[in-house]
């Protein structure tokens, strides 16, 4: 984005899954519905002559469902219903250009011929969301998360505003977690790092309409509760398709359908829809 650009996004998400809004919280035996909105504000600026941006992300809404647990004798099951509503965990995200993404004015941005680019990503998620240690399913996570990554990719076209622009982007990243000091029916829960790589292929069909195909691969995230491993390391792949329409330079809407394509027994499950409205000024 050109330096000085502001984006407001209002996102609606509905999904059937076995986790909260964060897939790293997947619980085997859970059957949950997540209905949330997300407010995001992004500001583009120059850092050491490179294009950079900061974003603040605030989710809100409800997660509800039921969890099937093993009974006290191990040979029967117990089903517990649960719901959580309110605000989710707030995130602050920074993306910083390193190669191929100079800071530009709007006029320079329109004339710039893109190519390869490499950047750095850093995100902090704070435990601000609704959380109750008597519930297995919560909107908040009661722990900090720290994500770092190195997005890189190629843009093929005469400019970023080209009506036939194609972009290929990869985002390798790792997320680290602090301990949850009030997990369900326990005293402490730690979680190993989660490793992730995203791939995005986006093509403009004209100045207004574009589509994107998305893939992710994830592994890690095993938890340890009160010093005992939960043996729930997660490995999964996910995918999705997005179609977007720009009604003007200031306003656009996109719709995404996506879900889990494959995974082990501890992995998140399900699929969902997302609608994203964008206002740029």
Predicted regions and their residues:
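Long, hydrophobic/aromatic-enriched structural stretches that serve as scaffold segments
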Residues: 33-102
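Outer-membrane beta-barrel translocator domains and adjoining extracellular loop/strand segments
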Residues: 18-25, 65-73, 105-110, 130-137, ...
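Surface-exposed strand-loop-strand hairpins of Gram-negative outer-membrane beta-barrel proteins
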Residues: 14-36, 80, 136-137
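Short loop/turn motifs that connect adjacent beta-strands in outer-membrane beta-barrel proteins
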Residues: 1-4, 46-52, 100-117, 157-166, ...
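Residues on the lipid-exposed face of transmembrane beta-strands in outer-membrane beta-barrel proteins
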Residues: 10, 39-43, 92-98, 122, ...
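Outer membrane beta-barrel transmembrane domains
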Residues: 19, 180-281
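Transmembrane beta-barrel strands of outer-membrane/channel proteins
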Residues: 8-16, 54-60, 118-126, 166-176, ...
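Residues that define the transmembrane beta-barrel architecture of outer-membrane proteins
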Residues: 4, 31-37, 50, 81, ...
